[in-house]
C-alpha cells in the first residue's frame, strides 16, 4: 500500500494507492511517499521510476552497522522506533527513509504508530511542510515527544515498583523480577533508539543537501535527544538501585528462614536428648517404674523446648 502526500495550493492532500498503477500526480508536487508492507513489484517500480535503491533483505538492513549514507542524488536512513503492540508490549521496529529530489520515501513493515501522528500533523499544518526534509524533521520531533512520554511512564512504574518492594505489597517475587526486567529492557531499548537518532541527526547536519533552516531545527532536536539519553542513564541507575534493594530484601527473608530452622533445630535438641535417655535399655531406671514417669518426661521435654525459644527472643534472634 502506498500513501502519497502532495501539495495542492495551500493544502497537503493525502491519497492512497494499492500500487503505483494509476498514479497521476506531478513529481514536483509530491512531499512524501509512505510505503507500508510494500510488495517486490512496488519496490521495483519505485527503483525504476525514481532511481531509488532499496535493500529488500530485511535481515541485512537490521544487522547493518551503517544507518546513514548518501550519494550524489539521495540520502538513505535506517532508524529504529519503539512500538506498542495489542498486548501493550513495547518493542523496536525499523523504518527506512530515503530522500531524493526533496521527496521523502518511507518504507516499513507492520504498524508504526508514530506515522499516524505525523500524518495528522502534516495534514493539519500544511504551511510548515515544503519538502521531504521538513517532514523528516517533524518525524524526529514527534519521536522526541513520544520518548518523553515513554520515560515518564518508566519513571512512574519505577516508583510503583520501589513502593511495592519497600512496603511488601501483594506482588510475588517472580512478578517483581518480571516487571523489573521489562523496565530495564525497555529503558535500554529507548536509550539505543535515542543514540540512533543522535547519530542520524549529526550526519544530516554535515550534509550539504540540508538547508540552513532545517539544520537549525535539527540542532535543537539533537539537544533534546541528548537530554533524553541522560534521562535513560538516570533511569538505569534507579532500576539498578531497585534491583539491589530487592536482592537485599530477598537475602533478609532467606536469613529469617534459616534462622527459624536453626532455632527450631536447637529447640528440639533437648527433648530429643531426654527421649533418647529414656529409650536406653538400662535395667535400673527408677522413672520407668514410676506411675507419673511418662507425664514427667513429657513436661521436661516441653520445658526444654520452651526455654531455648525464650532465650532466643531475649537475645533478639527471633
Curated annotation (Swiss-Prot):
Superkingdom classification of source: Bacteria
Catalyzed chemical reaction(s): Mg(2+)(in) = Mg(2+)(out)
GO cellular component: plasma membrane
Predominant cellular place of this UniProt entry's protein: membrane
Transmembrane domains' residue ranges: 260-280, 292-312
Localization per record: Cell inner membrane
Sites annotated Essential for ion permeation: 255
UniProt keyword annotation of Transmembrane present: yes
Complexes and interactors: Homopentamer. In the absence of Mg(2+), interactions between subunits are weakened, and dimers, trimers and tetramers can be observed in vitro.
Biological role: Mediates influx of magnesium ions. Alternates between open and closed states. Activated by low cytoplasmic Mg(2+) levels. Inactive when cytoplasmic Mg(2+) levels are high.
UniProt free text on domains: The central ion permeation pathway is formed by the first transmembrane domain from each of the five subunits. Mg(2+) binding strengthens interactions between subunits and leads to the formation of a symmetrical homopentamer surrounding a closed ion permeation pathway. Low Mg(2+) concentrations trigger both a conformation change within each subunit and a loosening of the interactions between subunits. This results in an open ion conduction pathway. In addition, this results in a less symmetrical shape of the whole complex.
Annotated protein name in UniProt: Magnesium transport protein CorA
Lineage: Bacteria, Pseudomonadati, Campylobacterota, Epsilonproteobacteria, Campylobacterales
UniProt gene name: corA
Amino acid at each position: 500500500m502506498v500513501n502519497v502526500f502532495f501539495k495542492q495550493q495551500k493544502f497537503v492532500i493525502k491519497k492512497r494507492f494499492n500500487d503505483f498503477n494509476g498514479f497521476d500526480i506531478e513529481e514536483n508536487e509530491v512531499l512524501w511517499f509512505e510505503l507500508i508492507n510494500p510488495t517486490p513489484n512496488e519496490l521495483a517500480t519505485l527503483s525504476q521510476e525514481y532511481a531509488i535503491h532499496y535493500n529488500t533483505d530485511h535481515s541485512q538492513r537490521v544487522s547493518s552497522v551503517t544507518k546513514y549514507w548518501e550519494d550524489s542524488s539521495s540520502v538513505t536512513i535506517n532508524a529504529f522506533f519503539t512500538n506498542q503492540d495489542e498486548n501493550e508490549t513495547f518493542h523496536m521496529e525499523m523504518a527506512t527513509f530515503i530522500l531524493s529530489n526533496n521527496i521523502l520515501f518511507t518504507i516499513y513493515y507492520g504498524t508504526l504508530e508514530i506515522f499516524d501522528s505525523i500524518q495528522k500533523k502534516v495534514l493539519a499544518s500544511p504551511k510548515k511542510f515544503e519538502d521531504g526534509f521538513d517532514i523528516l524533521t517533524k518525524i524526529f520531533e514527534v519521536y522526541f515527544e513520544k520518548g518523553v512520554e515513554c520515560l515518564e511512564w518508566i519513571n512512574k512504574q519505577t516508583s510503583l515498583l520501589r513502593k511495592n518492594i519497600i512496603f511488601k505489597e501483594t506482588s510475588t517475587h517472580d512478578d517483581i523480577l518480571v516487571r523489573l526486567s521489562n523496565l530495564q529492557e525497555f529503558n535500554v531499548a529507548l536509550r539505543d533508539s535515542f543514540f540512533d537518532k543522535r547519530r542520524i541527526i549529526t550526519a544530516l547536519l554535515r550534509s550539504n543537501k540540508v538547508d540552513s533552516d532545517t539544520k537549525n531545527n535539527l540542532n535543537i532536536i539533537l539537544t533534546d535527544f541528548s537530554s533524553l539519553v541522560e534521562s535513560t542513564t538516570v533511569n538505569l541507575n534507579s532500576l539498578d538501585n531497585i534491583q539491589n534493594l530487592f536482592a537485599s530484601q530477598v537475602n533478609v527473608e532467606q536469613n529469617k528462614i534459616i534462622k527459624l530452622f536453626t532455632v527450631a533445630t536447637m529447640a528440639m535438641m533437648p527433648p530429643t536428648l531426654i527421649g533418647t535417655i529414656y529409650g536406653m535399655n538400662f535395667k535400673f531406671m527408677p522413672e520407668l517404674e514410676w506411675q507419673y514417669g511418662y507425664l514427667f518426661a513429657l513436661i521436661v521435654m516441653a520445658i526444654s523446648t520452651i526455654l531455648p525459644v525464650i532465650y532466643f527472643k531475649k537475645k533478639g534472634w527471633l
